[in-house]
Amino acid sequence: MKNIEDLIQKAVELQSNGLVTGQIADELNVSRETVTWLLTRSKKEVAAPAPKDISVNWSNIGKSATRLHYISLALCDMVLETLEETNAEVDVVVGVAASGIPLASMMANELGADFALYHSRKGQDVVQPGQKGTISRNFGGVAGKNCVIVDDVITTGSTTMEVIEQLREMGAKPRAVAVLVDKKGADMIANVPIRSLVRIVRLD
């Protein structure tokens, strides 16, 4: 996407295809607030100031299995470094649906670990208090296991926090989080180290 108008058009298109705010935010790698702003702006309603956000388009990586493989190797290298520093191991790599899945499955293979899939609650337009995401039963279990969480982008950190809390409630031990891009700029979330290939820091 080259400009705001492209983002607005894509947000409207995704909404017309039935995606809700959280799913659109995940697809465009922006916050829910930015999606709301884009959709409001598309209707030419009262102009609100643009949220401070950055859109990340990593489709040139995502469309190539070869590129995904090499990126997953780089993420594995960072995770192994973190595990060595913290004297921890990995039993399960947890991919956050949907964009964390391809990287997580390749990383699990490389690390000789099981693969688990996490469905976040952010895909729902209205999230009720106490509502949680889920670990898919079709993949590896996490109870009592050392886990590495993999996603594409950290925007606010809320999804990462959700996954960490859910894993802990299930008796798992989150040991590290690996992402392509960290827009939050955090070293840790809930005492779990964050490792990213790219960290974005706003100077305003």
Swiss-Prot record:
SUPFAM superfamilies: PRTase-like. It comes from the Archaea. One of its GO terms (biological process) is regulation of gene expression. PROSITE patterns: PUR_PYR_PR_TRANSFER. GO terms for molecular function: DNA binding; orotate phosphoribosyltransferase activity. Signal peptide: none annotated. The keyword Transcription applies. Pfam families: Pribosyltran. CDD domains: PRTases_typeI (cd06223). Keywords: DNA-binding, Transcription, Transcription regulation. Contains an N-terminal DNA-binding winged helix-turn-helix domain and a C-terminal regulatory domain (or effector binding domain) resembling phosphoribosyltransferase (PRT) domain. NCBIfam families: PRK02277.1 (NF002620). Belongs to the purine/pyrimidine phosphoribosyltransferase family. GfcR subfamily. This is Transcriptional regulator GfcR 1. It comes from Methanosarcina barkeri (strain Fusaro / DSM 804). The gene is gfcR1.
